[in-house]
């Protein structure tokens, strides 16, 4: 499960990797992207063209937003995503790709401590995470969840 990731590439590097123009969209580097943070993402428009947009991490289905106790859903398990009411519609119609430099996975070390491990490509180039998205409730933000596997 991905709970933090790094998005630290320059606008030029992201533009080149995505074959897209990001001019005017500069989010800056983040070495600790956490849920609700804004990051670059790519989606396909109805016309078939790709669009680079700013996405907010954490999908919040309408029925979840009415409860202050429930957190946005940051991950969706690929094995069951099409069966879960929170994700099924987004999985069918609204997919995205999120570029990242790497992500953190925590491993339990000893009795109570957990150690973060940074996972990245050997050549330090961008990696791409599959995601699903929905329009945020009450605003125009595009909320996303990262697809994970077991």
What does each of the following model-derived ranges do?
Residues 1-150:
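Short linear sequence motif anchored by a di-proline
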């Amino acid at each position: 499960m991905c709970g933090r990731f790094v998005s630290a590439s320059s606008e030029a590097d992201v533009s080149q990797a995505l074959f897209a123009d990001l001019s005017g969209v500069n989010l800056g580097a983040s070495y600790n992207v956490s849920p609700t943070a804004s990051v670059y993402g790519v989606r396909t428009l109805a016309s078939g063209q790709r669009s680079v947009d700013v996405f907010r991490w954490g999908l919040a289905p309408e029925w979840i937003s009415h409860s202050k106790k429930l957190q946005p859903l940051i991950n969706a398990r690929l094995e069951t995503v099409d069966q879960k009411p929170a994700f099924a519609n987004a999985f069918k119609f609204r997919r995205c790709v999120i570029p990242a430099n790497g992500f953190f996975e925590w491993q339990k070390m000893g009795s109570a401590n957990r150690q973060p491990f940074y996972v990245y490509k050997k050549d330090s180039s961008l990696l791409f995470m599959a995601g699903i998205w929905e329009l945020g409730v009450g605003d125009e933000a595009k909320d996303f969840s990262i697809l994970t596997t077991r």
